[in-house]
Regions:
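Amphipathic alpha-helical interaction modules
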Residues: 29-67
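Short, well-ordered alpha-helical segments
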Residues: 60-77, 91-94
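Amphipathic, coiled-coil-like alpha-helical segments
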Residues: 2-33, 85-124
Length: 124
C-alpha cells in the first residue's frame, strides 16, 4: 500500500519548494552583506537587493502561508532600520533562519495533512 499527496497538498508543496529556492537567494544576499560588513564596506547597496529579493517571496506566500509572508516582510523592515550594521546583519541572519525553519516545518505539516492512502482513493 502506497500513499501520495492530494491535489491541494501538491500545489502547496510546489509553492513551498519555490519559496525555498527564493529564500536561498535572499540568504546569499544577506551573507554577502555580512561579508561586506566584516570588511567595513558600505551596506547601502544591499538594502535594495534585499527588498527586491524579498518582495516575490512575500507575494508568493501571502495567499496560503501568511505567517511566513509576515516574517519575510519583517526581514525587509529590519534591513531598512537604523542602528549598527553588525546588529542589523545579525538580525537579518536570524530572520532568514526563522523563515527557513518555518518553510521546513510547514512542508512537513502539509505532507502529513494531505497524504492520501492509495486504497482510500481506489474505494471512492
Amino acid at each position: 500500500m502506497g500513499s501520495h499527496l492530494d491535489g491541494s497538498g501538491t500545489a502547496k508543496l510546489q509553492t513551498l519548494e519555490h519559496a525555498v529556492t527564493l529564500v536561498q537567494k535572499l540568504n546569499t544576499i544577506v551573507e554577502r552583506m555580512a561579508q561586506s560588513q566584516r570588511m567595513l564596506q558600505p551596506l547601502a547597496q544591499y538594502r535594495q537587493q534585499i527588498q527586491r529579493a524579498a518582495a516575490p517571496i512575500a507575494s508568493l506566500l501571502k495567499p496560503q502561508f501568511e505567517p511566513i509572508s509576515v516574517m519575510v516582510t519583517n526581514l525587509v523592515i529590519v534591513s531598512t532600520r537604523g542602528g549598527s550594521d553588525q546588529q542589523k546583519v545579525r538580525s537579518m541572519r536570524e530572520s532568514v533562519a526563522q523563515i527557513k525553519a518555518a518553510l521546513d516545518a510547514t512542508a512537513s505539516r502539509v505532507r502529513k495533512e494531505h497524504t492520501v492512502a492509495d486504497s482510500d482513493e481506489k474505494e471512492s
